[in-house]
């Protein structure tokens, strides 16, 4: 069923917080989080495991995190240090394969199908990479090994922290039978709730469904859901991959009809956009930022502004203009925010010009 492909997904454990604890051992056993401050509103980028015991999580508003853990130590973040560590980790990957697809500073896909290291064993390569990262950077990583990308990503989360999980081609069918649909990358809370209302909780449930029905109900997402439930993922590890945008969106359980509701959603989405952008672009330089609205008739519209840095006030103003001019009385079922990243060549020109 599967091509002889060996994919590893490596995911660093609470990466930003781990770098801080490594560089300041006094932080190691106390709850810490990166992002926000006690004086200003913000969002948690990463929390260490002592903080997670109190319920503190990534993308959580700082105020909520402090309510859960009043003695939480908040750190502003040192993105130069994180980028330096990320570059070192990527260099370690390159010792084993040239087929590396970075997803952010702290995770990447590796295709080790043709690697001669460790007698060609992807399991042993993953173990050796994790050990090398620890030996050279004193940081831990988790890894997943599988014949397709989405399963490798799911597997890397199975034995966190500092562990790995392997799904061989022969084990895929049994693994999928009981895999919750919410574990599939791209299946959010709203989609999972709709699927559960249809009696679909696991990939095994979807395997019994008619593809045409899923396409009618969910469109393109229905096909992806059906394919993933069958273990199908045709995407190759793309070492030329250049991330062009970062976005975040929310599909509402019920359509909204008032601007105040839309503005409140943007206020909640913005910190998550800020967090995601910081993971891939710590200096936060961008080319454009914009908004997306999807209406109750499934038509959608986007509007963008040229803007050098992420700016919430401009996003809200752009969304208000879009709401007033393009909604036409329709209900809104999805609100999204996104940024377009600078082309590397253009960015170099800007830096040289400073």
Swiss-Prot record:
Enzyme class: transferase
Cellular component terms (Gene Ontology): cytosol
Site (Substrate discrimination): 16
Residues covered by the UmuC domain: 7-188
Transmembrane stretches, start-end: none
SUPFAM superfamilies: DNA/RNA polymerases, Lesion bypass DNA polymerase (Y-family), little finger domain
E.C. number: 2.7.7.7
Cellular compartment(s): Cytoplasm
Catalytic reaction equation(s): DNA(n) + a 2'-deoxyribonucleoside 5'-triphosphate = DNA(n+1) + diphosphate
Gene Ontology annotations of biological process type: DNA-templated DNA replication; error-prone translesion synthesis; SOS response
GO molecular function terms noted in the UniProt entry: damaged DNA binding; DNA-directed DNA polymerase activity; magnesium ion binding
Keyword DNA repair included in the entry's annotation: yes
Catalytic-site annotation from UniProt: 107
Superkingdom of origin organism: Bacteria
Cofactor(s) the protein needs: Mg(2+)
Pfam family, one: IMS_HHH_1
Cofactor details (free text): Binds 2 magnesium ions per subunit.
Gene3D superfamilies per the UniProt record, alphabetical: 3.30.70.270, 3.40.1170.60, 5' to 3' exonuclease, C-terminal subdomain, DNA polymerase, Y-family, little finger domain
Keywords: Cytoplasm, DNA damage, DNA repair, DNA replication, DNA-binding, DNA-directed DNA polymerase, Magnesium, Metal-binding, Mutator protein, Nucleotidyltransferase, Transferase
Ligand binding (Mg(2+)): 11, 106
Entries under HAMAP family matching the protein: DNApol_IV (MF_01113)
Protein family per UniProt: Belongs to the DNA polymerase type-Y family.
Summary of subunit composition and partner proteins: Monomer.
Protein task: Poorly processive, error-prone DNA polymerase involved in untargeted mutagenesis. Copies undamaged DNA at stalled replication forks, which arise in vivo from mismatched or misaligned primer ends. These misaligned primers can be extended by PolIV. Exhibits no 3'-5' exonuclease (proofreading) activity. May be involved in translesional synthesis, in conjunction with the beta clamp from PolIII.
Protein name: DNA polymerase IV
Organism this protein belongs to: Shigella boydii serotype 18 (strain CDC 3083-94 / BS512)
Gene: dinB
């Amino acid at each position: 069923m599967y091509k002889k492909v060996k994919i590893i997904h490596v995911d660093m454990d609470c990466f930003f917080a781990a770098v801080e604890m490594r560089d300041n051992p006094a932080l190691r056993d106390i709850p810490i989080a990166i992002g926000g401050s006690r004086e200003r509103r913000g969002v948690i980028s990463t929390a260490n495991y002592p903080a997670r015991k109190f319920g503190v999580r990534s993308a959580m508003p700082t105020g909520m995190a402090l309510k859960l853990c009043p003695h939480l130590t908040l750190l502003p973040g040192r993105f130069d240090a994180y980028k330096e560590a990320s570059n070192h980790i990527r260099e370690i990957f390159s010792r084993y394969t040239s087929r590396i697809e970075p997803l952010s500073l702290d995770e990447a896909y590796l295709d080790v199908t043709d690697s001669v290291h460790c007698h060609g064993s992807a399991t042993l390569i993953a173990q050796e990479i994790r050990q090398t990262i620890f030996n050279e950077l004193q940081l831990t990583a988790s890894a997943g090994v599988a014949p397709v990308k989405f399963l490798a990503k799911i597997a890397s989360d199975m034995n966190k922290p500092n562990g790995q999980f392997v799904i061989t081609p022969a084990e895929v069918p049994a693994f999928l039978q009981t895999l919750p649909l919410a574990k599939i990358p791209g299946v959010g809370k709203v989609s999972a709730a709709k699927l559960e209302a249809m009696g679909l909780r696991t990939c095994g449930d979807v395997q019994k469904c008619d593809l045409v029905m899923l396409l009618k109900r969910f469109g393109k997402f229905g096909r992806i859901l059906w394919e993933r439930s069958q273990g199908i993922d045709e995407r190759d590890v793309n070492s030329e991959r250049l991330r062009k945008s970062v976005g975040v969106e929310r599909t509402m359980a019920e359509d909204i009809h008032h601007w105040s509701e839309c503005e409140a959603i943007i206020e909640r989405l913005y910190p998550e956009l800020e967090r995601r952008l910081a993971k891939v672009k710590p200096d936060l330089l961008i080319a454009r930022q914009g908004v997306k609205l999807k209406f109750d008739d499934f038509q959608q519209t986007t509007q963008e502004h040229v803007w050098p840095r992420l700016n919430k006030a401009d996003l809200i103003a752009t969304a208000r203009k879009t709401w007033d001019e393009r909604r036409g009385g329709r209900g809104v079922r999805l609100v999204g925010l996104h940024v377009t990243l600078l082309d590397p060549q253009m960015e170099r020109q800007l830096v040289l010009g400073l």
